[in-house]
Amino acid sequence: LLTDWYLNREFTNSELRILIDGLLFSKHIPYRQCRERVEKLEGLSSQHFRARVRHIAALPQNRPDNRQLFYTIDMLDEAMEKGRQVSFHYCHAGMDHQLRPQMNEQRNPKEYVVNPYQLVAANGRYYLIANTEPHSNVSHYRVDRISDICLLETPVKDPRQVQGLEQGLDLSQHMAEHPYLFAGESVRATFRAKKHLLNDLEDWFGPAANYFHETESALDVTVKVNQEAMFYWALQYAPFVEVLE
């Protein structure tokens, strides 16, 4: 009989709950793979903890079914570590809810050759920040829509040769300027917002937002942001936002 022994777990219950909730709220992980990883995390906990997370059984099944997701992430990590290009097919959903690759003019799956620079999580999904050959601008790809990825021998293009990345990739600035991960140029936008949106403004733009002309009910805001993203952001808050320029 052993005495004076105790189990020191790697994660506290609250840390495990945060990790599990992160999986539950991630929209890009297929249902089966999500459940498998939740069960792995549960295995790191006590029976007492597992009894307290019954909400896991309510995991919705209306998730994407790209079972290549984790392989894709591994390949992108390897490509970025080795500084090499990748090729892949990029999928779109059909009316039957299935993902199918985009086709070229010959009705064959279109092959994208891409210079991968960074993986980011935004709006509950994984995105790849990249450059698509032979173009010179920044591209954003939903990782859960990438299929049939291959690691190429070609060295990755220097990001300083990519329009918008001439000074390198400043990730915090890039994310502030591209809240919806649209590609394209960033512009300086000024809009008037109701003051009750201040928390939302901080969530979306953070320190990149410049506030001025404050009144009792509204304030003016200037941000540098992707033009198309600004259009959709303003639509989302249409009753409370007026774009000035």
Residues of each region from the PLM?
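Bulky hydrophobic/aromatic content
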Residues: 5-103
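Loop-centered beta-sheet repeat module
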Residues: 77-139
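Polybasic (Lys/Arg-rich)
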Residues: 169-245
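A structural signal for short hydrophobic beta-strand segments in well-ordered beta-sheet cores
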Residues: 119, 149, 211-212
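Flexible linker/loop signature enriched in Pro/Ser/Thr and Pro/Gly
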Residues: 134-171
